[in-house]
Regions:
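Gly/Ser-rich "nucleophile elbow"/oxyanion-hole loop immediately N-terminal to the catalytic nucleophile
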Residues: 46-49, 96-129
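Bacterial Sec-dependent N-terminal signal peptides
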Residues: 1-21
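A domain-start/cap signature at the N-terminus of enzymes
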Residues: 17-53, 127, 132, 137, ...
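Short, proline-enriched alpha-helix->beta-strand connector loops that line the catalytic pocket
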Residues: 84, 166-171
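C-terminal catalytic histidine-bearing segment of alpha/beta-hydrolase fold enzymes
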Residues: 170-174, 180-233
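Primarily recognizes the serine-hydrolase "nucleophile elbow" in alpha/beta-hydrolase
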Residues: 112-114, 120-166
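The conserved beta1-alpha1 loop
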Residues: 55-59, 152, 175
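Active-site machinery of serine-nucleophile hydrolases
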Residues: 51-53, 57-105
Length: 233
């Protein structure tokens, strides 16, 4: 379990009272919010040498407190019958919340500090809500990641505008053509924008896939091989 506190300072200045005086003032307050994330961490058999770290963000169906849910899809599912010589981090988003980029970033820093991780080989992927979270986290901290793999994720307005912030991150986007939950146009639009400044980007659209375009990606050794070959510039 990971807990993270956010402190905020607000400043309010009042002007123009409606009577015969103008009043100005200063008000300071401290706001504290606590964020708690459960997470699963796979540690490679040999960690004497620095190893890569792969972060997986699940979709909305795996929210909650049952940590086993983060193993239903993605890298942890792959690990049930295969091996990966890397740290695999799968945080769990609480019910009634969505992925918070700053909380995720602080969790990654904690995992880095406590384990023998290669800082130039940190990879980020996610599906559906996790694809959205992966986009947002990559744009918030582009300096951290060596590769990005968003699957069936919607894209916020800011990444659409500031697309070149991740120009140096090799990116593979996947989506189903007949996705009736997250329209494929999200992936098509961000791909076209990123392609102008990121030469190392690809978009794969599965003609026969609905929202679940992730199973065939995460169940395939190729995506892990590709990610682990990438090194941060």
């Amino acid at each position: 379990m990971f807990k993270y506190l956010i402190f905020g300072i607000t400043l309010l200045i009042s002007v123009n009272s409606n009577a015969q005086k103008n009043i100005t003032g200063k008000f300071n307050t401290e706001i504290v919010t606590t964020h708690t994330l459960n997470y699963a961490l796979h540690v490679p058999k040999s960690s004497k040498e620095k190893k890569p770290l792969l972060i997986f963000l699940h979709g909305s169906g795996e929210k909650g407190t049952d940590i086993e849910l983060v193993k239903v899809h993605g890298p942890f599912k792959y690990l049930k019958s295969n091996s990966l010589d890397a740290y695999i981090l799968a945080p769990q988003c609480p019910d009634n919340e969505y992925w918070d980029s700053e909380v995720l970033y602080q969790l990654i820093l904690k995992i880095q500090k406590e384990n023998n991780i290669d800082p130039n080989r940190i990879y980020l992927t996610g599906l559906s809500m996790g694809g959205w979270g992966a986009w947002n986290l990559a744009f918030a901290h582009p300096e951290m990641f060596a590769a990005l793999v968003p699957i069936a994720g919607f894209v916020d307005r800011v990444p659409m505008i500031e697309n070149c912030k991740i120009a140096d991150i090799p990116t593979k986007i996947f989506h189903g053509l007949v996705d009736d939950v997250v329209n494929v146009d999200y992936s098509i639009t961000i791909y076209k924008k990123l392609k102008k400044c990121n030469p190392n980007i690809s978009l794969t659209i599965f003609d026969d896939a609905g929202h679940d375009s992730w199973t065939r990606v995460y169940d395939n050794k190729e995506i892990y091989d590709w990610m682990f070959q990438q090194t941060k510039k």
